[in-house]
């Protein structure tokens, strides 16, 4: 079941245009035509009406769009008319709050309840309304009582339970639960939500044992009997669409990824104890901190053909939001950097529009604040050393983009359920 809707909304927008993903196949050496519409030819020297340097790839003609950091995809009609998908949120941290904020601008999803044992309704309203990174909430929010918020005229119930099994999701009307506490990240732990009547749980973090999905890459492998799923990490959501396009067109033999990642809540404001990661205990605003990440290896879980071919690391830097992936890879097929750019641009305008972006502008990190796409390829930041070895650079709003994908995955799951 294809994903019917991908939200493209900025932090200041009240509109929610949507796009549709088209089917795409796995990389296959014997393919004549790839999932992106490229046909391999020994004689053609045209790409979408424009010459490319090697003359090896011929793409279907597409209508070009302006390649900017915040280009919005076109709106399409929803394919489901069974009402809004009812969602509950467990954990009102960065992702929980942004998932709720974005959901209020969507016409396909309604958040009906939020659980957080450490935040009461008044403080919840304050944290939701004011955001140092994404700005003040543009809608209305009121506290009705200790257990009820009113957001844009609609009520959201507030619960304060430490044990997920005690949250009465069914009574609250929530069928899908976003597990964004950062605590219950395994199937066994997240399954506690099912005891309260939730039908499905979406973990907003990597999971050791839950099926992992990246919208635009492998969400079509989701099955209705999967009750607990993971939306992977923000970095995997950035890297996987990029790797998918490059691997399907040219083949990736091996690659090393570095993410230059904005500060997150797990870091220290000043030097402090961090027994598992000594460097991670150093002051976040004072240092560039090398760190480990499983994001690159996780790509092998959503793209099995890349399993064991990618690994990587992170540098935590003193910026509040927006991160960037640097993928240095060796290709199986000879291709110039211009060829790779052309393939990514084509995908960004068609099969992966709204997920993968493309820009040739001289952008910096703040230009992607509030960008809902998972990955925006920076054509002028990368470089090729040879026809099989190159560095690719792609930006992502690690908060806003990721939170959009959480909701997109939920809606895809709801569409699959509705089609049965």
UniProtKB/Swiss-Prot annotation:
Tissue spec: Expressed in shoot and root vasculature, leaf veins and vascular tissue of flowers and siliques.
GO BP: any one term: intracellular amino acid homeostasis
Effect of loss of the gene: No visible phenotype under normal growth conditions. Gapcp1 and gapcp2 double mutants have severe dwarf phenotypes with arrested root development and male sterility. Pollen grains show shrunken and collapsed forms and cannot germinate.
Signal peptide range: none
Pfam families, alphabetized: Gp_dh_C, Gp_dh_N
Reactions it catalyzes: D-glyceraldehyde 3-phosphate + phosphate + NAD(+) = (2R)-3-phospho-glyceroyl phosphate + NADH + H(+)
Top-level division of the source organism's lineage: Eukaryota
PROSITE patterns: GAPDH (PS00071)
UniProt-annotated catalytic positions: 234
Amino-acid positions noted as binding NAD(+) in the UniProt annotation, renumbered to this chain: 94-95, 116, 162, 398
EC number: 1.2.1.12
Cellular compartments annotated: Plastid, Chloroplast stroma
InterPro entries the UniProt entry points to: GlycerAld/Erythrose_P_DH, GlycerAld_3-P_DH_AS, GlycerAld_3-P_DH_cat, GlycerAld_3-P_DH_NAD(P)-bd, Glyceraldehyde-3-P_DH_1, NAD(P)-bd_dom_sf
Molecular function GO labels: glyceraldehyde-3-phosphate dehydrogenase (NAD+) (phosphorylating) activity; NAD binding; NADP binding
Enzyme class: oxidoreductase
Marked site positions, Activates thiol group during catalysis: 261
Alphabetically ordered keywords of this record: Chloroplast, Glycolysis, NAD, Oxidoreductase, Plastid, Transit peptide
Transit peptide: 1-66
Sites where the protein binds D-glyceraldehyde 3-phosphate: 233-235, 264, 293-294, 316
One annotated Gene Ontology cellular component of this protein: plastid
Record-linked SUPFAM superfamilies: Glyceraldehyde-3-phosphate dehydrogenase-like, C-terminal domain (SSF55347), NAD(P)-binding Rossmann-fold domains (SSF51735)
NCBIfam families the record matches: GAPDH-I
Function: Involved in plastidial glycolytic pathway and plays a specific role in glycolytic energy production in non-green plastids and chloroplasts. Essential for breakdown of starch to form sucrose for export to non-photosynthetic tissues, and to generate primary metabolites for anabolic pathways such as fatty acid and amino acid synthesis. Plays an important role in plant development by providing substrates for the phosphorylated pathway of serine biosynthesis in roots. Plays a crucial role in pollen development. Functionally redundant with GAPCP1.
Family to which this protein belongs: Belongs to the glyceraldehyde-3-phosphate dehydrogenase family.
Quaternary organization: Homotetramer.
Name under which the protein is recorded: Glyceraldehyde-3-phosphate dehydrogenase GAPCP2, chloroplastic
Gene expressing this chain: GAPCP2
């Amino acid at each position: 079941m294809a994903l019917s809707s991908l939200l493209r909304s900025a932090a200041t927008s009240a509109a929610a245009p949507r796009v549709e993903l088209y089917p795409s196949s796995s990389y296959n050496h014997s393919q004549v035509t790839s999932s992106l519409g490229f046909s391999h030819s020994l004689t053609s020297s045209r790409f979408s009406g424009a010459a490319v340097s090697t003359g090896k790839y011929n793409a279907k003609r597409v209508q070009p769009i302006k390649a900017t950091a915040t280009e919005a995809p076109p709106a399409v009609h929803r394919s489901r008319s069974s009402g809004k998908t009812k969602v509950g949120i467990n954990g009102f941290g960065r992702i929980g709050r942004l998932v709720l904020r974005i959901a209020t601008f969507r016409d396909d999803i309604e958040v009906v309840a939020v659980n957080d044992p450490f935040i009461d309704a008044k403080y919840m309203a304050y944290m939701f309304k004011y955001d140092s990174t994404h700005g003040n909430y543009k809608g209305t929010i009121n506290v009705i009582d200790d257990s009820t918020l009113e957001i844009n005229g609609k009520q959201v119930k507030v619960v304060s339970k430490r044990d997920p099994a005690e949250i009465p999701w069914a009574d609250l009307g929530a069928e899908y639960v976003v597990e964004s506490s950062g605590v219950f990240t395994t199937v066994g732990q997240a399954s506690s939500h099912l005891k309260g009547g939730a039908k499905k749980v979406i973990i907003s973090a990597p999971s050791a044992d839950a099926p992992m999905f990246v919208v635009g890459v492998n969400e079509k492998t989701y099955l209705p009997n999967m009750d607990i799923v993971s939306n992977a990490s923000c970095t995997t959501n950035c890297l996987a669409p990029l790797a998918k396009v490059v691997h399907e067109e040219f083949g990736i033999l091996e690659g090393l990824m570095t993410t230059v990642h904005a500060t997150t809540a797990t870091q220290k404001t000043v030097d402090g104890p961090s027994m598992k990661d000594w460097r991670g205990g150093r002051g976040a605003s004072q240092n560039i901190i090398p760190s480990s990440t499983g994001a690159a290896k996780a790509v092998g879980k959503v793209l099995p053909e890349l399993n064991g071919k990618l690994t990587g690391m992170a540098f935590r830097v003193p910026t509040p939001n927006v991160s960037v992936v640097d993928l240095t890879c060796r290709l199986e097929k000879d291709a110039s950097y211009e060829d790779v750019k052309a393939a990514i641009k084509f995908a960004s305008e068609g099969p992966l529009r709204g997920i993968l972006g493309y820009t040739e502008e001289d952008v910096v990190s703040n230009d992607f604040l509030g960008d809902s796409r998972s990955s925006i390829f920076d054509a002028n930041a990368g470089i090729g050393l040879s026809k099989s070895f190159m560095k690719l650079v792609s930006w992502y709003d690690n908060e806003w983009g990721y939170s959009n994908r959480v909701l997109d995955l939920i809606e895809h799951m709801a569409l699959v359920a509705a089609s049965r």
